[in-house]
Amino acid sequence: MTTSTNIHDQRILILDFGSQYTQLIARRIREIGVYCELWSWDVDEADIRDFNPNGIILSGGPESVTGDESPRAPQYVFEAGVPVFGVCYGMQTMAEQLGGKVAGSSMREFGYAQVEIVEPTSFFKNIEDAVAEDGNGLLDVWMSHGDKVVEIPSDFVKVAQTDTCPFAAIANEEKHFYGVQFHPEVTHTRQGMRIIENFVLNICGCENLWTSANIIEDAIANIKEQVGDDEVILGLSGGVDSSVVAMLLHRAIGDKLTCVFVDNGLLRLNEGEQVMDMFGDHFGLNIVHVKAEDRFLNALAGENDPEAKRKIIGHAFIDVFDEESKKLKNAKWLAQGTIYPDVIESAASKNGKAHVIKSHHNVGGLPDDMEMGLVEPLRELFKDEVRKIGLELGLPYNMLYRHPFPGPGLGVRVLGEVKKEYCDLLRRADAIFIEELHSADLYNKVSQAFTVFLPVRSVGVMGDGRKYDWVVSLRAVETIDFMTAHWAHLPYDFLGKVSNRIINEVDGISRVVYDISGKPPATIEWE
């Protein structure tokens, strides 16, 4: 079964050379309405042929093209007969592989720059931020490079320059090969979206087929084709990903879906009641409510290592699903909310340079002998795309745009060993923090906010007595892409109010601190 529109028919291939911004390129292309995939640079020619892209983008990267062992694009990229767009490192390796030269620079260019367009091409057609005195177009861009192209291939022309970068953009119009030394995918490059859009839609000739309505239609058709008349079991947490999966499956197979809501003791305050009310009472899904707090906490007893805790929680979920599936006669499929960044992070490059940043319980840690097949309808989607189709499916905005919550829940927000006492205290403290953020109209002004339980006691004075009670840390960050983040400068009066409420209303907590660490060097979550 297929949809009336093949939404994968026109597509862009992005080869990843390791830039922290590479996923942004893919997200920008999806926002334009075109499907794309992100692969490691060391892909085989046969795989590119099979994918048959309308165009290829070579990403930036941290290494130097001048190094003997530095990554190179497969030569077939330049023989495939499709447009190629090199970004930063991608432009440098393209230039060198096609006969140009790259050299290290005595002056590293990092930050804002103004690029002067010196040669009219289809690549920058009608795209500029300002006009120079000589009539040339000017672009405000974001640079991040040390090396630079010092000689271009003989069949290329110089398109743009800066005072310190003689080849800020290059082009071979006949072959539709283009390169820029700046990063169009970041918001700091003001016309970046238009540059990418022009390449994808006009130069590569792609259509805007990748829309929320088409994605939903395609996902439903694929689910029906994959599972047939079998029953499917889904772990419903109430988070964005599992909620959207539940709605897609419900539309596709109706009552053949059984959602298992596992109350593992690691959820937010009143989350269980909210999930059952929304999906059971309002949307009419078939939900099995499993109360497994003791099971999870017993499995976590004595464990302090964050990665080990993630694996324990993941295995416990799978065990519960296996048990529940045995009660369903035809349950042969386990649905999961795996999304595209999970897949990217968990995929190791063939050359061994890639590594798993954090294990995702949706992708890693699954037992080899798991008895069910996997259904992952969101596997191709970024989080912003998941939210958009969630709205299209009728889920409420405030649920879809809630701050991120880790899959292992409070299991990684209670530092060290996880105990029921710690979780109960953390739940109440966190609820106060989030409630006050909403009351002060600050919730949507920060990207993520939560409370962390610290397993240390601190002296406090309550009434006439001294007592030793626990410490919690408030964490709030501002970020565009969650790759880097700044700590949120919340008002002192606000922080004081939250601290007073937590200490006065949550018996067992004597001290509240505020985390002012950025990412990097710290990560957003503590574990």
Swiss-Prot record:
Q: Which GO CC annotations does the UniProt entry carry?
A: cytosol
**Which SUPFAM superfamilies does the protein's record reference?**
Adenine nucleotide alpha hydrolases-like, Class I glutamine amidotransferase-like, GMP synthetase C-terminal dimerisation domain
Catalysed reaction, written as an equation: XMP + L-glutamine + ATP + H2O = GMP + L-glutamate + AMP + diphosphate + 2 H(+)
Q: Please list the residue ranges annotated as the Glutamine amidotransferase type-1 domain.
A: 11-209
| Residues that coordinate or bind ATP | 237-243
- Catalytic center residues: 88 (nucleophile), 183, 185
What UniProt keywords are attached to this protein's entry?
Answer: ATP-binding, Glutamine amidotransferase, GMP biosynthesis, Ligase, Nucleotide-binding, Purine biosynthesis
Mind telling me which CDD domains this protein's record contains? GATase1_GMP_Synthase, GMP_synthase_C
NCBIfam families (UniProt xref): guaA_Cterm (TIGR00884), guaA_Nterm (TIGR00888), PRK00074.1 (NF000848)
What protein name applies here? GMP synthase [glutamine-hydrolyzing]
Per the UniProt record, the source organism is Photobacterium profundum (strain SS9)
> Which classification does the entry list for the species?
Bacteria, Pseudomonadati, Pseudomonadota, Gammaproteobacteria, Vibrionales
Gene (name only): guaA
